[in-house]
UniProtKB/Swiss-Prot annotation:
MF terms (GO), sorted A to Z: ATP binding; protein serine kinase activity; protein serine/threonine kinase activity
Residues annotated as domain CRIB: 12-25
Compartments (UniProt record): Cytoplasm; Nucleus
Annotated catalysed reactions: L-seryl-[protein] + ATP = O-phospho-L-seryl-[protein] + ADP + H(+); L-threonyl-[protein] + ATP = O-phospho-L-threonyl-[protein] + ADP + H(+)
Organism whose genome encodes this protein: Pongo abelii (Sumatran orangutan)
Disulfide bonds: none
Residues modified as Phosphoserine: S560
Protein name according to UniProt: Serine/threonine-protein kinase PAK 6
Oligomer status and interactors: Interacts tightly with GTP-bound but not GDP-bound CDC42/p21 and RAC1. Interacts with the androgen receptor AR. Interacts with IQGAP1 and PPM1B.
UniProt keyword Magnesium, yes or no: no
Stored Gene3D superfamilies: CRIB domain, Phosphorylase Kinase, domain 1, Transferase(Phosphotransferase) domain 1
Entries under CDD domains matching the protein: CRIB_PAK_like (cd01093), STKc_PAK6 (cd06659)
Cellular component GO terms held in the UniProt record: cytoplasm; fibrillar center; nucleoplasm; postsynaptic density
Location, primary (coarse class): cytoplasm
Amino acid sequence: MFRKKKKKRPEISAPQNFQHRVHTSFDPKEGKFVGLPPQWQNILDTLRRPKPVVDPSRITRVQLQPMKTVVRGSTMPMDGYISGLLNDIQKLSVISSNTLRGRSPTSRRRAQSLGLLGDEHWATDPDMYLQSPQSERTDPHGLYLSCNGGTPAGHKQMPWPEPQSPRVLPNGLAAKAQSLGPAEFQGASQRCLQLGACLQSSPPGASPPTGTNRRGMKAAKHGSEEARPQSCLVGSATGRPGGEGSPSPKTRESSLKRRLFRSMFLSTAATAPPSSSKPGPPPQSKPNSSFRPPQKDNPPSLVAKAQSLPSDQPVGTFSPLTTSDTSSPQKSLRTAPATGQLPGRSSPAGSPRTWHAQISTSNLYLPQDPTVAKGALAGEDTGVVTHEQFKAALRMVVDQGDPRLLLDSYVKIGEGSTGIVCLAREKHSGRQVAVKMMDLRKQQRRELLFNEVVIMRDYQHFNVVEMYKSYLVGEELWVLMEFLQGGALTDIVSQVRLNEEQIATVCEAVLQALAYLHAQGVIHRDIKSDSILLTLDGRVKLSDFGFCAQISKDVPKRKSLVGTPYWMAPEVISRSLYATEVDIWSLGIMVIEMVDGEPPYFSDSPVQAMKRLRDSPPPKLKNSHKVSPVLRDFLERMLVRDPQERATAQELLDHPFLLQTGLPECLVPLIQLYRKQTSTC
């Protein structure tokens, strides 16, 4: 009577109006699934492709720019801080946009970044895999060093003394330094004589030591222009390998001048008004339309002379403030060993350019007592741009608003090295757009996110993917681009073979885009079939600008290890100075990809392939007997080891092979064939 009544089971009806639209099966011959939904198929395809790499330990350094002083800290409020930092951000170029990191990352962060490179081999020093007898180079002291940082040839291995940790100048000194001319320096020299004790004191904002960092010790021992300093270690004069004798009177005089100049920095910072730390607008660099700037000798400057001085810091060996991916004329010791100026550009002694070069290369780090430095270990990242500061800088570049209010029907269609790509629909127009979503916290180098916005916004071309808008959504950067339904060229070359008319059509479109970008001083640095997208009517467009760089007359070369291993040019792998010629080499590898179905050495590991590309003769076609002599000549003009002998994009547009170029419609059958092969069974 009092028993609990059982609940009546709900009745669940069968599916209504059910339609079997997707049928997935496994093809044992091909060893893959067929009939997968498009978003699943795209994810599987992209996971199999090699990812681009950025070696954080090999980042090109640049000279000091005014805005970087503010990045290292300011006494102004946050709003004024960001406004002063980016008052001219709308005209920001990639040269300056890549410089928002305050200083070199710590060893822990470098190790984490290396673990993100997409291959287990990159967890260790890449140099140990790329060592070869030809890879020896000299340090500023004339010692030959191998790529893996071994013992200098011709010298006994000597114990490396405990290095002294650096300290960073107070805020506003760089801006103050730029306003100082030769006359002011001479007038302040007497005042600086009374401040010698400042060289031994430690300011509150001391930079953290990394004396226990083995990788940092290795970088300090290297002294190579290609390697970004692994730490900010500064050794004493007696700690250099080779044990030089006592300095000459002229050397001591130059060293004293440099120390007096540093002392003046400390004294002027204590009395400088707050307004002196606010930088002016960042210098605007005009794009460089010349591929190879002329080289000529210049009279040696003070910076070049300082290379051989036994001072407390080897000038030009360490980057004072930035880890940006731009090359500095002061670091180009091979092309201009006796000058501290840009090759082919002379500046009179004492000119603002010369003084700026001296300041940026030698006068920003001071030695510090190791016992004091150990106490600053807790505040290790005080000089690094915070996440909120970086977001504020990025917010000044992107469009305002929330794209989630404008878009709907998100479908993930791909995944890359920097983020995911979704297909979405605009609510007001119904147009389909591709949305690239990149998490700011998961980037190998977050500064490169500016490239996604700045390059595609400023350089529009018929053969370049159009960017509609960019937004900052929470912790992600969203870039809205046109959606090309034909897919990537990779999908086609991996399934079918292209005839020479189709190869010429693709090459002509890519060369048109590269000729335009190179004339503007833009290096793509990741040319491959994955970066070439197609429309349904056969038009070819270049995409993926996340790893590009910009050169100019002031920054004519780059030297960072950036790109996808199998498509990298030899000069990129060997960390030599390079310019737009690296894109031509990568295009040549892509031509091999269109003929053979895959790039050379694709069965090797990425590191092994890079070693072969660096040390071996240019790769050849597997099916060279199937191509015409004019195509072979076209390919040989691109795959030349010497960048100076390699053809430019404009020269290749005049090559006879491109006379076979057809209309975009000639690529439509390839797109349709691929879509048919991947359609539902």
